[in-house]
Amino acid sequence: MSRLIIVFIVVTMICSATALPSKKIIDEDEEDEKRSADVAGAVIDGASLSFDILKTVLEALGNVKRKIAVGVDNESGKTWTALNTYFRSGTSDIVLPHKVPHGKALLYNGQKDRGPVATGAVGVLAYLMSDGNTLAVLFSVPYDYNWYSNWWNVRIYKGKRRADQRMYEELYYNLSPFRGDNGWHTRNLGYGLKSRGFMNSSGHAILEIHVSKA
């Protein structure tokens, strides 16, 4: 009987020792997921939006050749409600933040399609503002920099309009987009609003936009 008790104790100790590292790994994985959720897809104080925050969003995507972190600060005096994101190229695992009140900023990301495919991260996100008009943001991070460059744009459309291929073409080709040239650019958006934005020229891109009263 005593031998059986000793064997039982030894087996219990071994099982406990192997279970602890597994639990630690699971806890670390859960913590990583929480950190990602706290950044990409989050709504933060507009005053805290910075390059450092956007770099954290990029880092959460891991080792991806073409990726982008997007931050849009709402100082418009209006509440924004998410409509959709249209991807011309690439994808995102993040759901567009649903409500962005005045004084807050939304965080979002995009990346190339998974696998050995030559795609960039190119798309448009659309928000319905509380005045009934639509805020649209274009981001374009190409795969081939021999032929293309980073581009971005921000515009307001009259009425409610979802992002789609047509909106992408308008913002990319026709409505004076800004090159991602590591500099700040400003624009009068109409409807009593203006924008100030920055995009770098890297394949690991950050796009920071502030929309405020004109």
From Swiss-Prot:
The record marks 179, 195 as: Interacts with the lipid membrane. Residues 20-35 form a propeptide. Its main location: secreted. The record marks 147-148 as: Important in the initial contact with the lipid membrane. The keyword Transport applies. Keywords: Cleavage on pair of basic residues, Cytolysis, Ion transport, Membrane, Nematocyst, Secreted, Signal, Target cell membrane, Target membrane, Toxin, Transmembrane, Transport. Changing residue 148 to A: Inhibition of direct binding of sphingomyelin. The keyword Secreted applies. It is found in: Secreted; Nematocyst; Target cell membrane. A motif (Cell attachment site, crucial for protein stability) lies at residues 179-181. GO terms for molecular function: channel activity; toxin activity. One of its GO terms (biological process) is monoatomic cation transport. Residues 38-47 are annotated as: Plays an important role in the hemolytic activity. Residues 140-155 are annotated as: Trp-rich region, which is important for the binding to lipid membrane. Phosphocholine binds at residues 89, 122, 140, 142, 168, 172-173. Changing residue 184 to F: Expressed only 2% of the wild-type hemolytic activity. Residues 46-65 are annotated as: N-terminal region. Residues 1-19 form the signal peptide. One of its GO terms (cellular component) is pore complex. Belongs to the actinoporin family. Sea anemone subfamily. Octamer or nonamer in membranes. Monomer in the soluble state. PANTHER family: BRYOPORIN. Pore-forming protein that forms cations-selective hydrophilic pores of around 1 nm and causes cardiac stimulation and cytolysis. Pore formation is a multi-step process that involves specific recognition of membrane sphingomyelin (but neither cholesterol nor phosphatidylcholine) using aromatic rich region and adjacent phosphocholine (POC) binding site, firm binding to the membrane (mainly driven by hydrophobic interactions) accompanied by the transfer of the N-terminal region to the lipid-water interface and finally pore formation after oligomerization of monomers. Composed of a long N-terminal alpha-helix and a core region rich in beta-sheet structures. Before the pore formation, the alpha-helix binds the lipid membrane, partitions into the lipid-water interface and stabilizes the monomeric molecule on the membrane. Finally, it traverses the bilayer, thus forming the transmembrane pore. This is DELTA-actitoxin-Aeq1a. It comes from Actinia equina (Beadlet anemone).
